[in-house]
């Protein structure tokens, strides 16, 4: 199998496009898609300058997606005076798993010479995920606890780091799964929120207010291609599933999508093309509907619809066991 562009041995065949690419042309293709997404989403404001630079905080977990995203962003903007890249890693406290991925984060940040911040659940909340899973006071999946804690720390420390944007390594598979889940739940208001929260053109989004705007530059690249890119570039990615992973519904959607993609190549791209258009339309229709005024949490000061935020209620519940 030869590369369509140069005749060298191909390392991959993209069934959705018919392309056969060698290692160099494949990696260039991934990088091109990430850079195109950055342009199409207008991530870099027109007024960004060396005197008024943007700070982009990257959620760096050490997994393949965030490692590849950080590598490509550094390759693209590492010497651009209009942008400062900062890597933010959250250590949840999962024995035998997170320490290895943190090592990957530290190695990558040192290799790229970018500012790297490490934050732990234990330091910030006085808990570790292993203990939370064992106690499970709310009888919830581990991911339900972890999602609340991670979002809080990413938002809080991105703000402390002066972030203009918070970037995460969600790939095409991740986003197509989320799109299908929103379709199946029939929640158009959630689709509208998705546009303003992370997938919309920045010039068309509603202002994020006190929250850090989010972006997903890797969302046009399939998961397997992200993994292949990490391998070919010999990046220090920790490719192991979290031992507490428990999103059963998303797992079903993942298997459904993989089967559809196998039988009908291009399904994920088609889903996202339609979903992004629908998200923009629903954002115009539902934007602001049901919006509630946010208060400062009585305990930690974070924004919440009630008096005490979800994170603080969970911590109280865990400590009571």
From Swiss-Prot:
One GO CC term, this protein: cytosolic tRNA wobble base thiouridylase complex
EC number: 2.7.7.-
Post-translational modification note: Sampylated at Lys-204 with the archaeal ubiquitin-like protein SAMP2. Polymeric chains of SAMP2 are also linked.
UniProt xrefs under Gene3D superfamilies: HUPs (3.40.50.620)
Pathway: tRNA modification; 5-methoxycarbonylmethyl-2-thiouridine-tRNA biosynthesis
Linked residues for Glycyl lysine isopeptide (Lys-Gly) (interchain with G-Cter in SAMP2): 204
GO molecular function, one term: CCA tRNA nucleotidyltransferase activity
UniProt keyword list: Isopeptide bond, Transferase, tRNA processing, Ubl conjugation
GO biological process, one term: response to heat
EC supergroup of this enzyme: transferase
Deletion consequences: Cells lacking this gene are nonthiolated at the wobble uridine position of tRNA(Lys). No effect on cell growth or yield at 42 degrees Celsius. Transferring the cells grown at 42 degrees Celsius to 50 degrees Celsius results in a slow-growth phenotype.
Summary of subunit composition and partner proteins: Interacts with monomeric and polymeric forms of SAMP2. Interacts with UbaA. Interacts with archaeal EF-1-alpha and Pan1. Non-sampylated protein forms a complex with archaeal CPSF1 of approximately 100 kDa.
Function as written in the Swiss-Prot or TrEMBL entry: Required for thiolation of mcm(5)S(2)U at the wobble uridine position of tRNA specific for lysine (tRNA(Lys)). Probably acts by catalyzing adenylation of tRNA, an intermediate required for 2-thiolation. May also act as a sulfurtransferase that transfers sulfur from thiocarboxylated SAMP2 onto the uridine of tRNA at wobble position. Required for cell growth at elevated temperatures.
Family, similarity comment: Belongs to the TtcA family. CTU1/NCS6/ATPBD3 subfamily.
PANTHER family for the chain: ATPASES OF THE PP SUPERFAMILY-RELATED, CYTOPLASMIC TRNA 2-THIOLATION PROTEIN 1
The name this protein goes by in its record: tRNA 2-thiolation protein NcsA
The gene coding this protein: ncsA
